[in-house]
A protein has these predicted regions:
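Phosphate/nucleotide-binding beta-alpha loop and adjacent structural elements of enzyme active sites
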Residues: 1-177
């Protein structure tokens, strides 16, 4: 398992959980954020300094909802793409992919499009905010174009009554036979 976590606030929580659960030999942390370019320095904008917090944005000035994002913390960090990591044999092609990055899911998919058709990839779980229509549509179109079909989408029941998060779902796609 390769876990990509560029946020310094979340890295501490992730590494602690890996250690507590004795997964040090099973999970490798990569602090490099993914996006649609092979490599480059971009801004990582963070909502705050909360450990385990979300609502961060890499390489863009919008948040999970597509609206302008005003970060409380911002710094430059090196990012790369799935295409670059796989083309240079830094990583092996995965069987399963989970993407939950608060607004740039489509950019990460675009940065991995060279390999998405590979038969080794069986399934992709991706969190999408349906109120961010362009990002949701782009993500679904990239996956369909690369031979994935939607199995289901769901979210926590608590999201049903949340004005802020009611349009956020985990979509599960599987590779067509």
């Amino acid at each position: 398992i390769f876990a990509f976590e560029p946020s310094t606030s979340n890295l501490r929580v992730l590494s602690r959980n890996i250690s507590i659960n004795n997964f040090s030999n099973k999970i490798i942390i990569n602090q490099t954020p993914l996006f649609d370019k092979d490599f480059g320095f971009q801004k990582l904008n963070e909502e705050g300094f909360n450990e385990g917090g979300a609502l961060n944005a890499f390489s863009v000035d919008y948040g999970y909802d597509g609206k302008k994002f005003n970060p409380k913390n911002s710094y430059n960090i090196y990012g790369t793409s799935i295409n670059f990591l796989l083309s240079n044999n830094i990583l092996e092609i995965p069987d399963y992919i989970k993407i939950d990055v608060d607004g740039i899911e489509d950019l990460i998919l675009k940065g991995g499009e060279k390999y998405l058709k590979h038969e080794k990839i069986k399934s992709i779980l991706i969190e999408l905010n349906e109120s961010f229509v362009d990002q949701t549509s782009n993500s679904i179109n990239i996956l369909k174009k690369n031979n994935f079909e939607l199995l289901y989408k769901k979210h926590s029941k608590e999201f049903d009554t949340s004005e802020k998060y009611s349009s956020i779902y985990n979509y599960v796609f599987k590779k067509k036979n």
